[in-house]
A protein has these predicted regions:
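Extracytoplasmic beta-rich repeat domains
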Residues: 7-9, 24-39, 48-51, 62-79, ...
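Short loop/beta submotifs within extracellular cysteine-rich repeat domains
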Residues: 12, 22-23, 175, 185
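Short loop/turn segments that connect beta-strands within beta-propeller blades
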Residues: 16-20, 56-60, 96-100, 136-140, ...
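Conserved catalytic cores of soluble enzyme domains
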Residues: 174, 208
Length: 208
């Protein structure tokens, strides 16, 4: 197997998992903070050069790139041949993995550093405009928006999905659970500091 990892110098490295030997490198135009994704026989990685890059997993050769209007900070979510990128340009973009063409885009109303969570034909993610969005991908529109009724704070954390809930951390020092269908608040849990990490759900529990 092969491990793919980006660095702050803007280089994506392919390393053999067995012995750690370098297989290839690919230089982008700026730092890489997103995790690479392998989908459809293609390595996808976003960068601060405002691009989503698609590379050959064996050679590192560029297959295509898609230029957005802002930095691509978060990891893409891939489903049914589409890479969903919620980026710093305030757009949720669906990019075809096969050829790098944009299928559609939906305005988010704010930039995001979170990776979209996909389930049931919807995408869920928070923004730096203090909102969490539930986006209907078939209708290509925002189904609901959540904003805390008293506090204003960004959602940097990527969401986890389970038991009909969207669970993510907020910079208000709380973990928030929202109803996935309606976006209404289900519960919150207070922590001692802002929650930028992404929750994981297993065995009926949330770990963060």
């Amino acid at each position: 197997g092969t491990v793919y990892v980006g660095d702050l110098a803007g280089v994506l490295h392919a390393v053999a998992a067995q012995d750690g030997k370098a297989a290839w490198t690919f230089k982008t135009g700026a730092e890489i903070r997103a995790s690479p994704v392998v989908a459809g026989g293609t390595v996808l990685v976003g960068g601060y050069d405002n691009r989503l890059h698609a590379l050959d997993p064996k050679t590192g050769a560029s297959r295509w790139f898609f230029e957005t209007d802002g930095q691509v900070h978060a990891t893409s979510a891939v489903d049914a041949g589409l890479a969903y990128v919620a980026g710093c340009d305030g757009e949720l973009r669906a990019i075809r993995v096969a050829d790098g063409k944009q299928a559609f885009s939906i305005p988010s109303g704010g930039y995001t550093g979170a990776s979209p969570a996909l389930q049931g034909g919807r995408a869920f993610y928070g923004t730096f405009e203090d909102e969490v969005l539930g986006v209907d991908l078939e209708a290509r529109k925002v189904a609901w928006r959540y904003q805390h009724p008293q506090r204003r704070f960004p959602f940097y954390s990527s969401a986890a999905l389970g038991d009909g809930k969207v669970v993510l951390g907020g910079r208000d020092k709380h973990v928030h659970a929202l109803d996935a269908a309606t976006g209404k608040a289900a519960w919150t849990f207070a922590t001692r500091a802002r929650v930028d990490s992404s929750p994981a759900i297993a065995g009926g529990r949330v770990f963060v």
